[in-house]
Regions:
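Internal intein/HINT superfamily modules and their associated LAGLIDADG
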Residues: 1-24, 226
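Long, C-terminal-biased catalytic regions of enzyme "large/alpha" subunits
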Residues: 1, 25-277
Length: 277
């Protein structure tokens, strides 16, 4: 990464740099409304903007400590506090959105690092098996905690009653299918960790329909490239670019070897450029 530039391309909101087509931030698929900002003597119509209240779980850390439930619920509490305290009068669109939607985005980092550490290829069926179970659990516990907050405060996000949570449709696939490990390798990774069942989802469905949900948005996978280095992690849930990444900031160059890199797992850090996509 070199110098940073900001520009606006009206048609596609994308631009070409050094032969690469680049776009704006895309981890947030969230309601955004255009406000009507008028002259000083006219009244403005303020609608909802987007505030990225983001955080990421370190997959390796929560898996090795067998604390997916605890980490997820603590993260939702922390992110919810950020949303609640982000009361910016000078940016009324953000204030309105936070007050009405309480949106947060809990994501994850270090997927490739965790897989490589456990000798699992990123493209393998074991990797897909792991992701199906892990992110189902993050979804379950983040939703459960959001329901608990709504119950504790007696408050849901605005228009909850119009949502798929309220009519129960959101839960259809979870109450009809068990999301459990299918491969022996992944079964061993989740050994000693309780995995929510169809019955747990059915119970959560009842609780959500009764008490509501506090956060209109709960999960979002952020790119967290720089923050992943601080956490000794691979970035986000994406495959690595190289076993030793090189980043340039102005006049400084940083070399970052992938976490847990050894002679034994070297070939499990397959570059994204070499993968069949």
């Amino acid at each position: 990464v070199y110098d940073t530039y900001c520009f606006t391309e009206e048609k596609r909101h994308m631009g070409m740099f050094n032969g690469m087509l680049l776009g704006n931030c895309t981890e947030i698929m969230q309601l955004s409304e255009v406000s009507d900002i008028n002259a000083y003597y006219e009244e403005d119509t303020i609608r909802r903007g987007i505030s990225c209240n983001l955080g990421s779980l370190n997959i390796a850390t929560v898996m090795e400590n067998k604390r997916i439930k605890e980490a997820t619920k603590a993260a939702i509490d922390s992110l919810t506090m950020v949303s609640d305290l982000t009361n910016i009068d000078v940016v009324p669109t953000i204030k309105k959105a936070n007050e009405e939607l309480h949106s947060v985005g809990l994501g994850a980092m270090n997927l490739h690092g965790f897989l490589a550490k456990n000798f699992i290829m990123y493209e393998s069926k074991e990797a897909l098996d792991f992701c199906n179970v892990f992110f189902m659990m993050v979804n379950f516990y983040s939703l459960e905690r959001s329901m608990e907050i709504a119950k504790e405060r007696g408050e849901t996000f605005k228009d909850f009653e119009k949502s798929e949570y309220a009519n129960g449709n959101y839960f259809n696939k979870y109450v009809t299918k068990e999301y459990i490990p299918q491969t022996e390798k992944v079964k061993s990774l989740f050994e000693g960790i309780y995995i929510p069942t169809k019955e747990d989802w059915a119970n959560l469905k009842e609780q959500v329909m009764k008490h509501g949900v506090y956060n209109a948005y709960r999960m979002a996978i952020a790119p967290n490239q720089s923050t992943s280095y601080i956490m000794n992690s691979t970035a986000s849930v994406m495959p690595v670019v190289d076993t030793i990444e090189v980043r340039e900031y102005g006049d400084s160059t940083t070399f970052y070897p992938m976490p847990y890199l050894t002679n034994d797992n070297y070939f499990f850090y397959k570059s994204a450029y070499d993968m069949d996509q």
